[in-house]
Regions:
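Alpha/propeptide regions of enzymes that mature by internal proteolysis
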Residues: 1-303
């Protein structure tokens, strides 16, 4: 039986976005809107939410606009280490990769982890060896080179202010979708935090923290100060409050983001529930976000 509601919501990260020029905002809006329209058409034609979130996130990974894939920021040793995760609410299948340096689309490899292995999370060299064994695209690290991100790293090193490093973590990408079969899926991908220690892993590849999907309840993708999002299992907590406290999607997600603010944690999240209601709360200067459902027209916002 077809689900009456369906749709998708995406984000391009939360953080200090007030320095984006009008031209930069327009370029980002164009990319997000084009991706949303293409993703929505897949849903409209009966495509699966899992395929849709993988598609949307891989589109953002291929763009230098975001802190994921090609646009990933640098560690303190001037290398890029990427994390990603994806989850299906149908049976809670989930896959993730962390600290990969040569994977063109970490989100695609994350999906392969649960489809082709008995594991959920593969890290570093092991993840890249797995990618080679299944023919997943491996690229030279030069593919990810970014003069802009190197300048950000050197600026961060000169400041040596932890709060600044956290605020600079913008651009993480994510997508959450509900399809016509009622299946909810979520996906998140990031380059992490500028000037992070090599090997540091945040919330993005941690199921329940950066990504969560649960049919008949909701799906969530988060962005922000990963250590706090891990401690409070933010993505799953949104769905838990809906399930056990009978909160609405908006109440649950907004309350959690405000609670994080009270303890000094910055960030935001995107979420969709079983009725295609959407919530996009954040406690930062801005969060790049957009959505489209069969009940609402395409929407894009930063602030």
């Amino acid at each position: 039986m077809a689900n009456e509601s369906f749709g998708i919501v995406v984000h391009g990260g939360a953080g200090v976005l007030s320095n984006l020029s009008t031209e930069q905002q327009q370029i980002i809006e164009k990319k997000v809107s084009e991706t949303l329209i293409s993703a929505y058409k897949i849903l409209e034609n009966g495509g699966s939410s899992l395929d849709v979130v993988e598609f949307a996130v891989s589109e953002f990974e291929d763009s230098p606009l975001f802190n994921a894939g090609r646009g990933s920021v640098y560690t303190s040793e001037e290398v890029q280490e990427m994390d990603a995760s994806i989850m299906s609410g149908l049976d809670r299948s989930a896959g993730a990769v962390a600290s990969v340096r040569k994977i063109k689309n970490p989100i695609r490899l994350a999906r392969k982890v649960f489809e082709k292995t008995e594991h959920i999370l593969l890290v570093g060299d092991g993840a890249e060896s797995f990618a080679r064994s299944i023919g997943e695209p491996i690229v030279d690290p030069i593919y990810f080179y970014s003069e802009k991100n190197l300048k950000r790293l050197r600026k961060a090193k000169s400041k040596v202010v932890q709060n600044q490093l956290i605020q600079d973590k913008i651009g993480t990408v994510g997508a959450v979708a509900l399809d016509k079969s009622g299946n909810i899926s979520a996906a998140t991908s990031t380059g992490g935090m500028t000037n992070k220690m090599p090997g540091r892993i945040g919330d993005t590849p941690i199921i329940g923290s950066g990504t969560w999907a649960q049919n008949k309840i909701c799906g969530v993708s988060s962005t922000g100060h990963g250590e706090f999002f891990i401690k409070f299992q933010v993505a799953k907590e949104v769905c838990t409050r809906i399930e056990y406290l009978n909160q609405s999607l908006e109440e649950s997600s907004t309350d959690i983001i405000q609670e994080l603010k009270q303890i000094g944690a910055s960030g935001g999240l995107i979420a969709i529930d079983k009725d295609a209601n959407i919530s996009t709360p954040f406690n930062t200067d801005g969060m790049i976000r957009g959505s489209i459902t069969n009940k609402s027209e395409l929407n894009f916002a930063i602030y």
